């Protein structure tokens, strides 16, 4: 959880009876055999359940857009690509990609296409957008789906919910989400010293609270049984206000997680803790170091383990004037006024916090560290907007627009092991954003969204917008 929110305090079986039919023993034997086979297939399918896949879709040829593939290479002007059954099946330049028989053609001349975003750090389900209240009572399937729809609206294809999930719901949702909204991945319950993880009361009890190595290992074992996507730990004393998870415990967590082939990502604040976590085998950081600028020793520890990643999660800020119009697409007008007031006041602490982390991010990026993308969204912040604000912050910190886009697409998909996502390339899931202008020229152009496609289906943004803000059009 970030030190402040993006806006501070913003708030069926069908039974048919049939007459008996006389069958021979041979016939009944065949029937029993077939039923047995069907049961085996059904059980196997259930055990290997994956997120829902799109229904069969006809081919569509998209032509004329500038294409940013997500691999960091120069964009392709006047591109052409074919989407069929939820995947990119051919990508190239207009004139070299033929129109498949029976396919539709969509002209994107003047537009820019880029991969949909991947958010590696969210806390969904607690914030009720209508009431502007955070509460554990809001952690329902309906609210989680609403949050994922807001992600889809803003061009986010998948998110990792990082350590504050409860009960069976997150795992059910992980298996159920797919082509209709953003993919949901979960770290389940995180691990911290008791009552020393997230700040707020409404989710302080969500993580495991551990005091001994045995408790720490047991928590990891329970998470491993749920096949979580990551293990999240908090190593932070909140400016001396709570006990910090000690090295003996986080080393036990990392060791046990690795024994179960799980990776561990840390919420961290202090440079000294970051160094020791790297020595202990941490797999990634959910925030940048915040007390000091990183030094050569820290960079060297990172470079010695090139698979370790950083999610910068840059300091929060209130939305500026240009953001308010973007936010008004998905929020009712009565919520915009207090945001405008917050924006006018600004945050006196942000320049110092941002400068420290920006310099560190620039140095780590130059050193070749794996830079991912995350927002900490859900802590009362406008869902979806946070991703576009983070992209702008990363560029403000010194990354080029192309580098920020790679971090938010291909690299984050790789970190989350979503191998079929994060790029516009043959065989990949057709998750992409159509923009009215190029973010390579101005990163804030990621907000100029003309359309979003997930698994080849266009998200009905007008319908979603009308339901949230009462506005059916921009």
Please give the residue ranges for each predicted region.
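Glycine-enriched alpha-helix->loop->beta-strand junction motifs that scaffold or abut catalytic
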Residues: 278-285, 304-309, 368-369
């Amino acid at each position: 959880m970030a030190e402040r929110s993006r806006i501070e305090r913003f708030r069926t079986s069908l039974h048919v009876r049939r007459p008996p039919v006389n069958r021979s023993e041979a016939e009944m034997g065949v029937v029993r055999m077939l039923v047995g086979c069907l049961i085996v297939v059904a059980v196997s399918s259930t055990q290997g359940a994956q997120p829902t896949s799109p229904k069969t879709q006809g081919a569509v040829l998209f032509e004329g857009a500038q294409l940013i593939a997500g691999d960091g290479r120069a964009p392709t002007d006047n591109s052409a690509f074919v989407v069929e059954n939820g995947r990119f099946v051919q990508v190239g330049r207009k004139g070299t990609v033929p129109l498949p028989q029976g396919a539709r053609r969509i002209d994107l001349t003047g537009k820019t296409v880029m991969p949909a975003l991947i958010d590696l750090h969210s806390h969904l389900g607690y914030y009720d957008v209508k009431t502007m209240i955070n509460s554990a009572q809001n952690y329902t399937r309906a609210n989680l789906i609403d949050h994922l729809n807001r992600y889809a609206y803003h061009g986010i294809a998948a998110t990792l919910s990082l350590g504050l999930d409860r009960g069976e719901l997150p795992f059910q949702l992980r298996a159920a989400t797919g082509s209709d909204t953003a993919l949901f991945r979960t770290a389940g319950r995180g691990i911290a010293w008791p009552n020393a993880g997230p700040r707020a009361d409404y989710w302080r009890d969500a993580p495991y609270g551990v005091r001994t190595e045995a408790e720490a290992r047991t928590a990891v074992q329970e998470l491993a049984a749920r096949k979580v996507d990551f293990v999240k730990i908090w190593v932070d004393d909140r400016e001396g206000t709570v006990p910090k998870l000690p090295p003996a415990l986080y080393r036990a967590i990392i060791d046990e997680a690795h024994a179960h082939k799980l990776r561990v990502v840390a919420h961290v604040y202090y440079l000294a803790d970051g160094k020791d976590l790297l020595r202990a085998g941490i797999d990634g950081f959910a925030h940048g170091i915040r007390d000091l600028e990183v030094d050569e020793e820290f960079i060297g520890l990172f470079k010695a383990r090139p698979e370790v990643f950083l999610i910068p999660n840059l300091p929060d800020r209130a939305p500026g004037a240009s953001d308010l119009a973007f936010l008004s697409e998905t929020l009712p007008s009565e919520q915009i006024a207090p945001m405008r007031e917050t924006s006018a006041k600004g945050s006196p602490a942000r320049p110092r916090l941002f400068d420290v982390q920006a310099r560190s991010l620039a140095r780590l990026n130059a050193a070749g560290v794996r830079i991912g993308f995350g927002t900490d969204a859900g802590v009362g912040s406008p869902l979806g907007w946070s991703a576009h604000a983070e992209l702008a912050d990363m560029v403000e910190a010194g990354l080029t627009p192309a580098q920020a886009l790679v971090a938010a697409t291909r690299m984050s998909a790789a970190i989350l092991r979503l191998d079929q996502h994060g790029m516009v390339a043959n065989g990949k899931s057709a998750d992409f954003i159509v923009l009215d202008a190029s973010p390579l020229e101005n990163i804030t152009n990621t907000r100029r969204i003309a359309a979003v496609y997930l698994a080849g289906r266009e998200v009905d943004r007008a319908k979603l917008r009308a339901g949230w803000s009462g506005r059916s059009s921009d």
